[in-house]
């Protein structure tokens, strides 16, 4: 019987790719938040994003994760549109 060299907690390919999407989305969100002109708004948005991602960190349901990624993309695009309208 062949023994796997992977650690028992290794992610599947699908999980790995989904994790990369989430990390990329988080970084894009943080970069976009840096463009917000007011420091208090930036802090609020940064804390909100961090709390949302941390709260859902342990979620393993693939469908729920896909839904959350979609919602986060919508929030990111809405923030980008708002910043574009504000001229930032």
UniProtKB/Swiss-Prot annotation:
GO terms for cellular component: mitochondrion. Its main location: mitochondrion. Residues 1-19 form a transit peptide. It comes from the Eukaryota. GO terms for biological process: mitochondrial respiratory chain complex I assembly. Keywords: Mitochondrion, Transit peptide. It holds the Pfam family Complex1_LYR. It is found in: Mitochondrion. InterPro entries: Complex1_LYR_dom (IPR008011), Complex1_LYR_LYRM2 (IPR045293). Involved in efficient integration of the N-module into mitochondrial respiratory chain complex I. Belongs to the complex I LYR family. PANTHER family: LYR MOTIF-CONTAINING PROTEIN 2 (PTHR13675:SF0). This is LYR motif-containing protein 2. It comes from Danio rerio. The lineage of its organism: Eukaryota, Metazoa, Chordata, Craniata, Vertebrata.
């Amino acid at each position: 019987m062949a023994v796997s060299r992977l650690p028992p907690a290794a992610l599947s390919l699908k999980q790995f790719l989904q994790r990369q999407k989430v990390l990329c989305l988080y970084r894009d969100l943080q970069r976009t938040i840096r463009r917000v002109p007011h420091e208090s708004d930036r802090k609020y948005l940064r804390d909100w994003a961090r709390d949302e991602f941390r709260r859902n960190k342990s979620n393993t349901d693939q469908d729920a994760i896909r839904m959350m990624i979609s919602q986060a993309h919508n929030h990111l695009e809405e923030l980008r549109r708002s910043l574009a309208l504000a001229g930032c």
